[in-house]
Curated annotation (Swiss-Prot):
InterPro entries: Heat_shock_Hsp33 (IPR000397), Heat_shock_Hsp33_C (IPR016154), Heat_shock_Hsp33_N (IPR016153). Under oxidizing conditions two disulfide bonds are formed involving the reactive cysteines. Under reducing conditions zinc is bound to the reactive cysteines and the protein is inactive. Redox regulated molecular chaperone. Protects both thermally unfolding and oxidatively damaged proteins from irreversible aggregation. Plays an important role in the bacterial defense system toward oxidative stress. Keywords: Chaperone, Cytoplasm, Disulfide bond, Redox-active center, Zinc. This is 33 kDa chaperonin. The gene is hslO. The keyword Zinc applies. Belongs to the HSP33 family. GO terms for cellular component: cytoplasm. One of its GO terms (molecular function) is protein folding chaperone. GO terms for biological process: protein refolding. Disulfide bonds join 235-237, 268-271.
C-alpha cells in the first residue's frame, strides 16, 4: 500500500511530506495503457495532487489540471482528503527518450501552459488558482505554484522510474515547506541541504525511499513524525452517476440514441471502466 508521511522539524519552522506512490502510478499506467513519457507525466501529476490533498481538511476535493500546448495535451487529476486520487492524460501514447542515456523526456512535450488547482470545499464555491508552467517537468511547475499561488516557499521533488519494459518500477517524492517563524540561519541550512541533495531518482531507488528522502531533507536536524496516511488510485465513478449524466441530455436525445444506436456505451475518462446501457435501459430513463 502506498503511503504519505507528514513530518515537522523540532523547531516547528519546516514541514515535510515524503511519499511512496508506486502502486498509484502503476495502477494508472495499467488502466490507461500509457507509454513511457505519458506514464511519467501522468504519474508526476498524480503525486503532486496527493501532496496538495494532504494539505486539505474535511471532505474537500482537489482537481489539478496541467494544461500544456504540447504533445501530451491536458493532464487531469482529482484527489480527496482520504488518500484517493484518479487521473488521466489526453495523449497516453507519448514515448520519447534520450538516445544516449535512455532518459524519459517530459518537459519538451508538455509545452507552454498553466498549472491549475481547483479546491472544492463542498460549499458550491470552489477556489481556483493557477500559475504558468515554467519548465513542463511538473515537479518544478508544482513548486512554483506552491510558492507563487499559495505564498509558501517550497521545495518539491517527484518522479516516476520505469524498468526495462517501461513498466513502473518506483514512484514517489517529497515536499518541504518553510513555516512562519523560520530564521534566516535555518532557511540557509535547509536550502544548502536541498541543493546538495542527491537526484530524486537516486533517492527513489533506495531500499526504503521514504526514509532516504527524510534523511536527505533533515540531515542531522531532529524532526517529528506527525502521521502516516494510506494512498491509492481509486475512481468513484458509478453506473448511477452516468445514468444521471444521460438524463441531462433530455428525452429527445435519449430517444434518438435508442432508435439510432440501439443503446449506449460510456467510458469513464479517469479509469476506463465501461458502462453499457441497452435499449431497455434507455427506455427506462426516457420514462423516468
Amino acid at each position: 500500500m502506498d503511503k504519505l508521511i507528514k513530518t515537522i522539524s523540532e523547531s516547528g519552522s519546516f514541514r515535510a511530506y515524503a511519499l511512496d506512490s508506486t502502486e498509484t502510478v502503476r495502477t494508472a499506467q495499467e488502466k490507461h495503457n500509457t507509454l513511457s513519457s505519458s506514464t511519467v507525466a501522468l504519474g508526476r501529476t498524480l503525486i503532486a495532487n496527493q501532496i496538495l490533498a494532504a494539505n486539505q481538511k474535511g471532505d474537500s476535493k482537489i482537481t489539478v489540471k496541467v494544461i500544456g500546448n504540447g504533445s501530451f495535451g491536458h493532464i487531469i487529476s482529482v484527489a480527496d482528503t482520504k488518500g484517493h486520487v484518479k487521473g488521466y492524460i489526453q495523449n497516453p501514447g507519448v514515448d520519447i527518450k534520450k538516445t544516449a542515456t535512455g532518459e524519459v523526456l517530459v518537459g519538451p512535450f508538455m509545452g507552454q501552459g498553466q498549472f491549475v488547482s481547483i479546491i472544492d470545499y463542498g460549499t458550491g464555491n470552489p477556489y481556483t488558482s493557477s500559475t504558468p508552467l515554467i519548465s513542463g517537468e511538473i515537479g518544478e511547475d508544482f513548486a512554483y505554484y506552491l510558492t507563487e499561488s499559495e505564498q509558501t516557499p517550497s521545495a518539491v521533488g517527484l518522479n516516476v522510474l520505469l524498468d526495462k519494459e517501461d513498466k513502473v518500477k518506483v514512484a514517489g517524492g517529497f515536499m518541504l515547506q518553510v513555516l512562519p517563524g523560520a530564521s534566516e540561519e535555518e532557511i540557509a541550512r535547509y536550502e544548502k541541504r536541498i541543493q546538495e541533495m542527491p537526484a530524486i531518482s537516486t533517492l527513489l531507488e533506495s531500499d526504503d525511499h521514504i526514509e532516504a528522502l527524510l534523511n536527505a531533507i533533515y540531515g542531522d536536524e531532529p524532526f517529528k513524525r506527525l502521521s502516516e496516511e494510506e494512498l491509492s488510485f481509486e475512481c468513484d465513478c458509478s453506473r448511477e452517476r452516468f445514468e444521471n449524466a444521460l438524463l441531462t441530455l433530455g428525452k429527445d436525445e435519449l430517444q434518438a440514441m435508442k432508435d439510432e444506436d440501439h443503446g449506449a456505451e460510456i467510458v469513464c475518462q479517469f479509469c476506463q471502466t465501461k458502462y453499457e446501457f441497452s435499449e431497455a435501459d434507455l427506455e427506462e430513463l426516457i420514462n423516468d
